Amino acid sequence: MTDLHTDVERYLRYLSVERQLSPITLLNYQRQLEAIINFASENGLQSWQQCDVTMVRNFAVRSRRKGLGAASLALRLSALRSFFDWLVSQNELKANPAKGVSAPKAPRHLPKNIDVDDMNRLLDIDINDPLAVRDRAMLEVMYGAGLRLSELVGLDIKHLDLESGEVWVMGKGSKERRLPIGRNAVAWIEHWLDLRNLFGSEDDALFLSKLGKRISARNVQKRFAEWGIKQGLNNHVHPHKLRHSFATHMLESSGDLRGVQELLGHANLSTTQIYTHLDFQHLASVYDAAHPRAKRGK
């Protein structure tokens, strides 16, 4: 066994005995560190004292070229940094050569939006069951206002202004937003309110479970997924996909990025731009159509 292996074995014993990590976590550390052992051995290293920041960077590049994803590489480098920190604490190394070496950011995977035709099919649900009426109202509100799931389940009856077709929501950072919800959502909320007392009247929540309590986020996720299957949609339906679809459809129709930002409750415009997968060409076309200085003289 080489010094490279010996030090790793000592570190794993430390994690097991001193840190009392689970067997699964220990196995993950072992796999990550075996990868660097193999790379170090291939490059002629006999001990970890010979490892420098250049070798760690080369190891990261090699891992990426072999198909390791950004998130997995981040975990691998994290394990390596922890190992080298331990070697420093044992006076085996003077400094951590992996410090400052980071993996590229993992790409942000956004949910695909539901197109307008599929959305209409999703909303055209059988309403013979009072719970189906509730679900239809939730779907209409979620898609009609682009709410976050937490905002939907947090709605109370007092947050409604059905006469003006608006709803008050408490977003991230305890920031309130007053949002239009559309006439379809208003109609289905009214329909649900006519049936709501069948499940209870003491709770202030707008949307109740069949037990008469505020509906949970998990229950909403489950019901939306079930309706997606029942209505024959190919893609899994979850609440965030409705919010994403709202943003995409609003932006396609209006081109008003700032307005969509306000509706979504994003603090930064850049978040909205990424969220709605805008590209530069679309932004340029919005600018050319709207900005006075963009209009070319004849």
UniProtKB/Swiss-Prot annotation:
Keywords from the UniProt entry: Cell cycle, Cell division, Chromosome partition, Cytoplasm, DNA integration, DNA recombination, DNA-binding
Domain Core-binding (CB): 2-88
GO MF terms, alphabetically ordered: DNA binding; tyrosine-based site-specific recombinase activity
Annotated Pfam families: Phage_int_SAM_1, Phage_integrase
InterPro entries referenced in this protein's UniProt entry, alphabetically: CB (IPR044068), DNA_brk_join_enz (IPR011010), Integrase-like_cat_sf (IPR013762), Integrase_catalytic (IPR002104), Integrase_recombinase_N (IPR010998), Integrase_SAM-like_N (IPR004107), Recomb_XerC (IPR011931), Tyrosine_recombinase_XerC/XerD (IPR023009)
Subcellular location, record wording: Cytoplasm
Residues the record marks as active site: R148, K172, H240, R243, H266, Y275
Record keyword Protease present: no
Signal peptide: none
Gene Ontology annotations of biological process type: cell division; chromosome segregation; DNA transposition
Span of domain Tyr recombinase: 109-288
Regulation of its activity: FtsK may regulate the catalytic switch between XerC and XerD in the heterotetrameric complex during the two steps of the recombination process.
Any one GO cellular component localisation term in the record: cytoplasm
Family: Belongs to the 'phage' integrase family. XerC subfamily.
NCBIfam families per record: PRK00283.1, recomb_XerC
Quaternary structure and partners: Forms a cyclic heterotetrameric complex composed of two molecules of XerC and two molecules of XerD, in which XerC interacts with XerD via its C-terminal region, XerD interacts with XerC via its C-terminal region and so on.
Role, per record: Site-specific tyrosine recombinase, which acts by catalyzing the cutting and rejoining of the recombining DNA molecules. Binds cooperatively to specific DNA consensus sequences that are separated from XerD binding sites by a short central region, forming the heterotetrameric XerC-XerD complex that recombines DNA substrates. The complex is essential to convert dimers of the bacterial chromosome into monomers to permit their segregation at cell division. It also contributes to the segregational stability of plasmids. In the complex XerC specifically exchanges the top DNA strands.
Protein name: Tyrosine recombinase XerC
Organism: Escherichia coli O127:H6 (strain E2348/69 / EPEC)
